[in-house]
Amino acid sequence: MPLLSRSLRIIQNSPIRKVWNQVDTSPKHGICVPLFSIHTQNSCGIGEFLDLIPMIDWCTLCGFQILQILPINDTGSCSSPYNSISSISLNPLHLSISALPYKEEVSSSRKLIQEMQRLSQLSQVNYEKVIPMKRAFFKEYFRVCKSKNLTNHPDFCDFCEREKYWLHPYALFCSIREHLNYLPINHWSTTYTDLSYISQHEHTFAKDIEFYSYLQYLCFEQMKQVRKHADHKGCLIKGDIPILISKDSCDVWFYRKYFSSSESVGSPPDFYNAEGQNWNLPIYNMKTLRQDAYHWWKERLRYAENFYSLYRLDHVVGLFRFWVWDELGRGRFEPQDPKDYLDQGTDILSHLLKASSMLPIGEDLGTIPVDVKQALESLAVCGTRIPRWERDWEGTGAYIPFDQYNPLSVTSLSTHDSSTLALWWQEAPQEARLFAQFLGMPYTPSLSFHNHKEILKLSHKTSSIFHINLINDYLALCPDLISTNPLQERINLPGTISKNNWVYRVKPSIEQLSAHSKLNSLLASLF
């Protein structure tokens, strides 16, 4: 109780106390699942926006109050949701085709839709087939919309005007990119990289600009439906705002003053990765962002709050300092001086917190300076607690008791970048044995049903305000709902380029989940 009382005092003195008052500090429980991983009987090859509606129904049926998803920004042909070509636009790949009006007027639409729906029955997402099929469908569908004069509808015109800051550059970027057969920006000729040619390109690609803008309008409308349904059901949607953007993105092309392309961001060597990681993502020009009062960042949050009540602030320490790799492969922190990085992080966060009605939850895993953690807490920004990693690393290495977690946090047993609980138990037997001992459980080489259920139950009883686990860790309570190969239950292996990354598909459909009485009763008993 003293921990919670302290957190309540911090909240009431923070710039986001009004947001906190809306969410409240009672314990919250949720499920995290990538949108690309879910499917219904209507899904066309990949999880679609409106699939989130029955997903919300299932979550609330089981007693959860939060549905967390990974980023849903447009990633072009890339499967990683953290490597987007736009910081704001949604990914048209997730448009629910079956809900589009006049879809049946697309030539061979029935056959195309059936083919795409069959792809949803595969054990993994097949981007190589889904992306070209959906792109072809959308081209034909747009022609139908034009013939119906739908692009002159006042709602679409209002959307284009309201979102012109990001929408017009994005639509032009996509048009040029398609014209150049999706070449990366560093292979574009000066005609396309020199922004003085923009008015010329706007004329040349006018029809394509309208096409890409209309797709974004459809994405917006579908996600607004999802948000409306979530509000009706009392479910909070937690989005994910990647801190960085691809070098091959609209933002780096058009808002280039906010980025430095000569160096790239990554993570330093640490306990989990001896060599560190180079993410090959551009570093921000913080001086220019600050001069513009972080307008670019505020626009991202403004649009996202159409859909989300909470958001995961990816790699939140990056707002304070980044690990930067130069062209020779040498790494350093930028900025290095504690006063400089604390001033920088506190300044940008103060602006962002005041600019949004969403509650941020920081991803503060890895090497985080104590003073950064203290700064985040003083602003009432939650951190992330992964029990298997929550240990006294500076001292005995003992696990931190669950009732000693800072209430301003989310407890999660696994992340999209880690192994699932069962896979970790299998791959790290020494750690698993210590963890079982810490919890007072009998150790078994393979994670038993009893231990699995008890660990899940305990994860919902930590002193964190939020408790959100990957859907994979819940489904593992019923072996018929997961793959027989535990490696296929992993979403991503950081630092690797693999055909197994970002292709995870939930084995049962949402309809099957909703009808699975054994699983649903087990989940309802966890909290």
Curated annotation (Swiss-Prot):
GO MF assignments: 4-alpha-glucanotransferase activity
Subcellular locations according to the entry: Cytoplasm
GO terms, biological process: carbohydrate metabolic process
Enzyme class: transferase
Pfam families hit by this protein: Glyco_hydro_77
Alphabetical UniProt keywords: Carbohydrate metabolism, Cytoplasm, Glycosyltransferase, Transferase
EC number: 2.4.1.25
Signal sequence residues: none
One GO cellular component term noted in the UniProt record for this chain: cytoplasm
Catalytic reactions on record: Transfers a segment of a (1->4)-alpha-D-glucan to a new position in an acceptor, which may be glucose or a (1->4)-alpha-D-glucan
Protein origin, superkingdom: Bacteria
Transmembrane residue ranges: none
NCBIfam families (alphabetical): PRK14508.1-4
UniProt family annotation: Belongs to the disproportionating enzyme family.
Protein name: 4-alpha-glucanotransferase
Lineage: Bacteria, Pseudomonadati, Chlamydiota, Chlamydiia, Chlamydiales
